[in-house]
Amino acid sequence: MSVRIDRVAMIAEMARQDINGNRLVELSGVSRVTVTAVRNGKSCSKETADKLAAVLGRDIIREEA
């Protein structure tokens, strides 16, 4: 299943926690290419969204794609 991320919420939470893209890659285990794509509005798997959400400590799924 593919989902879309709430980019604004994701980027705001990254800023709030002072987590940059590289750190998000390290903490989540998600590839740099995927993190960049998600930050730019591309959809991702539910599994990927869950990994990113776990690091950020909040739900960031906007909708199923």
Where are the language model's segments positioned?
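Residue-level "edge-of-site" marker
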Residues: L27, V38, A65
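DNA major-groove recognition helix of helix-turn-helix/homeodomain DNA-binding modules
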Residues: E47-R62
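Residue-level preference for nonpolar/small residues embedded in alpha-helices
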Residues: D6, C44-S45
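Recognition helix of helix-turn-helix/homeodomain-like DNA-binding domains
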Residues: V30-S43
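A short, Lys/Arg-rich alpha-helix, primarily the initiator
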Residues: M1-E26, I61
